[in-house]
Curated annotation (Swiss-Prot):
Name the UniProt record assigns to this protein: tRNA 5-methylaminomethyl-2-thiouridine biosynthesis bifunctional protein MnmC
Localization (cell): Cytoplasm
Organismal lineage: Bacteria, Pseudomonadati, Pseudomonadota, Betaproteobacteria, Burkholderiales
Principal location: cytoplasm
GO molecular function terms noted in the UniProt entry: flavin adenine dinucleotide binding; oxidoreductase activity, acting on the CH-NH group of donors; tRNA (5-methylaminomethyl-2-thiouridylate)(34)-methyltransferase activity
PANTHER family referenced in this protein's UniProt entry, alphabetically: SARCOSINE DEHYDROGENASE-RELATED, TRNA 5-METHYLAMINOMETHYL-2-THIOURIDINE BIOSYNTHESIS BIFUNCTIONAL PROTEIN MNMC
UniProt region (FAD-dependent cmnm(5)s(2)U34 oxidoreductase), positions on chain: 259-672
Gene3D superfamilies: D-Amino Acid Oxidase, subunit A, domain 2, FAD/NAD(P)-binding domain, Vaccinia Virus protein VP39
Amino acid sequence: MTRVLEPAEPILSNDGTPYSPRYDDVYHSARGGLAQAHHVFLGGNGLPEGWAGREQFVIVETGFGQGLNFLATWQAWRSDPQRCRRLHFVSIEKHPFTREGLARLHAHAGLGDLLPLSDQLQQQWPDALPGLHRLSFEDGAVTLTLALGDVETMLPKLVLGADAFYLDGFSPSRNAEMWSDTVFRGLARLARIGATLATYTAAGFVRRGLTAAGFEAHKAPGFGGKRDMTVARFAPVWKNRRHAPPEAAQWAERHAIVIGAGLAGCAVTERLAARGWRVTLLDAHDGPARQTSCHRAAAMHAHVSADDSFLSRLSRAGNLHALRAWGALEAAGYPVGWHGTGVLQIGEDDAENAAQQAALAELRFPESFVRWMSPQEATEQHGATVPRGGLWFPKGGWVAPPDICRAQLAKAGAAVDALFNCRVAAIRRIGDAWQALADDGGVLAAAPVLVLANAYEADRLTSGQFLALRRVRGQLTDLAPAQAEALGGWPDCVVTGGGYLLPRDAAGGARMGSSYEADEGPLVERPEVHAANLDRLASMLPDRASQIAQIDPATLQGYVGVRTVTYNRLPLVGRIADDAQALSRAAALRGAHLRDLPRLPGLYAALAYASRGLTWAALCAELIASQIEGEPLPLEADLADAIDPARLLLRALRHGHAQAPESAGPGVDAAG
């Protein structure tokens, strides 16, 4: 993974064409970037005719540049009455412009009717952070997925089936890595049969490389004074891929059951409804967000580590995606009540502080995402009298999770049939439909797709053998307004360290936490845990320690709940494996990859978000909806694998620890 992204500079050549001093080349012909986009890329791929009447159409681009190809394609889609239902545009860019740089170039480009589209793009434009960034337009009908990083790094990380390719890197003589055989093979891995390709270059080695990768390539009339360009079609004469790329799903009925109406389930419900699905939402409680998601206030921020671990990457991607998703809800008239106060994460000791600073130096992320904040600045700017400095996340903050759930269900509207006070006792698959059963065996709902978003209760409904869900108890502590006032001041931002504290609410009260312990005994508040939370508070605000010591833990109230976690703290998201079938073929699958494992058709998990439900729910819901529809995934392949529900099964198979079961296991009846 490319960790440090160096943004491009918005420089113009003598004739006014955007120019890159890094590659000593222009971004497009002097005769105009939009005209080039229409002739070379739209025309060269037979668009818009090629997407007519399609459910979805996927374009992959190498070299986003200033985004003129995307804007021209988006405009062509909007103008076409025969347009595809959903347009996915996936573009790889190693040196993205900043938002300000993009705005300067677009102002110079004379975009005319495209200016409103440019404004929307600029509003959602991400920071220069490595990984995938999914931007949504036209109420989700047009999706731009930016893959920020080196092309040879990012291509293998894309999970999608492409219908068309735009090859728009700088000239092969200036940027050879964009035109390598490795890249051509990477394109072929993603291409659906018959996928088209176009590029402005007519270099012979490009056509030969494409041909070797399975494309039929030939010359076509060029643009802007160039006699020729290259067009191609993917038509391999032999099987050259272990796994074919995903195809657009063909569902006879777009109806899904979602079990669980917390952050995970409501997010999945909204994402499916946005794609035209009808959703039956089942929950054992009397409304949404009644269990672990019922907090009246919870914080969200990214995780940073020098090695940019799976946890760090997933948290960064989830944090950014959640903010965009919630912004879209707000813009559509469904307020979520986000408080962007910022989050200060201090180290618990000097060693952790040093590790935080080392991570910043290694990653060199934009300060708009994370930077160092000294204790002096924390005190002066935010009233946070912390003992040491820490990581400042300016886009972090807090929100009430139930408000998120209510906004998502309101957005889903009539597409969702929510059944509360409705306990699911078992699930089974009969024919092509999953059924959710009541305690008396009656069918509560039936649909071709079922999503388990019910935390540790999922163990009851599946064999559970390789989900390995664990319950971890957590207790929060509330301070009454008078108690918070007696401390003589309170930070106006979220502070995390050995524990965490949230800004005071509208009534003047405050919240802090949280314990993290094995789930044992009755689920009731314990004074000794409130006392431990007070100790955590004193460690973060040591100058208030004497006042904090005056608070009697026995007088405190709060909230106690159970987190669902896995062995490595990463969630379980995606298609659930068919354990019985896999174990019956254990010897044959010992050297398998995740994509080789048999899956239970139509059964998905959105589980084990632990204490990061706010961070992960929106992104993981988009992942599940994309898998169901056969769309490009919003996560890199290795990240999707890292949270795959079948990962523990795969590990058992590889180590020879998997044994064939005596039965299909409790919970899932796959009869029929």
